[in-house]
Amino acid sequence: MNKFLIIDGLNLVRRIYAAIPDENDMDSLTERVSVACTKLLRIHHPTHVTIVWDGDEMSWRKQLYPDYKKGRKPMPEPLAAGLPALQEHLKSVQIQSIYAAAEADDVIATLAMKTAKAQGEAVIVSTDKGFSQLNHPRISQWDHFNQQYLNITELEQKLGVDRSQFLDLLALAGDSGNKIPGIAGIGPKSAAELLRTFRTLAALFSSLPNLGAKQAKKLAEGRDMARLSYKLAQLQIDLPLNINLKDFRVNGPATTPQLD
């Protein structure tokens, strides 16, 4: 069975870079990233590996909602300047890059889902909990910095909803880290309570007459924003990839299928 290790490039590299005392020391960054990747390979024993990078194009989410991820700090100039050399180094040690046009998340999600549907196993290396919406038994998520898999049961308990409701929760309460708005006046706690009662957004919005007037008014006025927020939070899992798995094989090429 194929086991694909999919590394969220900037999620890994920026965290490592932030811990380097001298922001201009790209040699230290390259060394630390190499050590991290070697450790990942040793722990997970994948048949295939790639590291996926964000691109420079404006994402479809930003076009849809200009405030998406507004206020995020830009990449430090030394890191931006040193990234191509780091990517070349990783290539020299058989860790091939995939370059997304805009956000890496959709490419990672698509690659993981296509791998799982082809009866393979996908391990996503990222601290981004947005990947938890990929509800498939052959997809897991590894937190390199805490050296553990994302525990979905703990996350469900923390959020107060089932995994199948994660996107509905974001649609209602939003996500401040990514500037996904949600519905004004509906926080994570009240959103979770509503979803525990009504289970789905559709059932909730069809039951507004059963709610108190104040809350029903908030929900009715925020319905369009909830739809927008759901769309912004939802990962794309059907992008055309047009890659051949043999290019990402660990320890040399082998005859393996193409992922469209």
Swiss-Prot record:
Keywords: DNA-binding, Endonuclease, Hydrolase, Magnesium, Metal-binding, Nuclease, Potassium. GO terms for biological process: DNA replication, Okazaki fragment processing. Disulfide bonds: none annotated. Residues 164-254 form the 5'-3' exonuclease domain. K(+) binds at residues 172-173, 181, 183, 186. It is an enzyme of class 3 (hydrolase). Residues 185-190 are annotated as: Interaction with DNA. Mg(2+) binds at residue 105. GO terms for molecular function: 5'-3' exonuclease activity; 5'-flap endonuclease activity; DNA binding; magnesium ion binding; potassium ion binding. Binds 2 Mg(2+) per subunit. Only one magnesium ion has a direct interaction with the protein, the other interactions are indirect. CDD domains: H3TH_53EXO (cd09898), PIN_53EXO (cd09859). NCBIfam families: PRK09482.1 (NF007017). This is Flap endonuclease Xni. It comes from Shewanella sp. (strain ANA-3).
